[in-house]
């Protein structure tokens, strides 16, 4: 079964409907971008900001954002600044966000994709507690915080990465109830690697989606719409 993100994003906007109306166009998000920024992601942020009635302004650096008097910032450069000190940084881009993710707490500092994954599992009633979750990838924005949020929900979590032996990886995936693919290695695993009833969250395109005989949150139309909705909910908060 394909589990799409749009219904989850719609439900989140409905949950915040009163906030959206009360704060209409009063919240400002400063987006720090340059030539390395993903244009598709920028467009998605723009569309979602309009739905949430959040104003967007743009800067090319944290220094410029500071001179503009920015308070809430999102750095979409590659790589982003290691620490947006002095700002209310979205997507876990400062120490506060990393600490909250480490203790498994979802709040306005939590990395958005990690929170989106948990929200999707909850929306589709995918059990987490007591399940074996394999997270492939250890990035600061997705892999690590997702692992900690799953752990906080009483999953047994294994983190794999680019240095994990391929044989060990396949063995772990075969025994998993939940697999989060977030390493960006296209085609790393496919349906032959997972067991019946497993839920695969294909964040980074690692999973070959040629077969749909399982619960699949797809690369396109999956976590992405929920991630931008979570981002805007953080701005309102």
Language model regions located:
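N-terminal ligand-binding/catalytic initiation module
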Residues: 1-78
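Adenosine-phosphate binding glycine-rich loop
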Residues: 2, 9-18, 22-23, 28, ...
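Glycine-rich phosphate/diphosphate-binding loop of Rossmann-like nucleotide-binding domains
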Residues: 37-46, 69, 107-189, 193, ...
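Conserved Rossmann-like nucleotide-cofactor binding loop
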Residues: 79, 141, 206
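Anion-binding alpha/beta catalytic cores of soluble intermediary-metabolism enzymes, centered on
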Residues: 2-5, 63-128, 169-170, 187
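Rossmann-fold NAD(P)-binding glycine/threonine-rich loop
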Residues: 83-101, 196-237
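Generic structural signal for residues in well-ordered beta-strands
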Residues: 54-58, 157, 216
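Short hydrophobic segments within beta-strands
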Residues: 30-32, 90, 136, 160
């Amino acid at each position: 079964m394909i589990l799409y993100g749009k219904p989850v994003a719609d439900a989140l906007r409905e949950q915040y409907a009163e906030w959206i109306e009360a704060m209409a166009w009063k919240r400002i998000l400063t987006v720090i971008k340059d030539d390395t920024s993903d244009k598709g992601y920028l467009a998605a942020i723009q569309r979602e900001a309009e739905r949430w009635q959040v104003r967007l302004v743009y800067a090319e650096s944290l220094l410029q954002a500071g001179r503009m008097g920015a308070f809430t910032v999102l750095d979409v450069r590659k790589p982003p600044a290691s620490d947006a000190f002095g700002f209310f940084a979205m997507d876990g881009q400062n120490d506060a966000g990393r600490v909250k993710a480490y203790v498994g707490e979802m709040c306005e500092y939590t990395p958005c994709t990690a929170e989106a994954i948990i929200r999707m599992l909850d929306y589709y009633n995918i059990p987490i507690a007591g399940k074996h979750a394999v997270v492939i990838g250890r990035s600061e924005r997705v892999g690590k915080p997702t692992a900690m949020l799953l752990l906080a929900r009483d999953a047994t979590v294994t983190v794999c990465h680019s240095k994990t032996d391929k044989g060990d990886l396949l063995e772990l995936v075969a025994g998993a109830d939940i697999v989060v693919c977030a390493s960006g290695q296209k085609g790393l695993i496919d349906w032959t690697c997972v067991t019946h009833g497993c839920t695969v969250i294909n964040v980074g395109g690692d999973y070959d989606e040629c077969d749909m005989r399982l619960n699949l949150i797809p690369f396109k139309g999956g976590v992405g719409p929920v991630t931008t909705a979570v981002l805007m909910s953080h701005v309102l908060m």
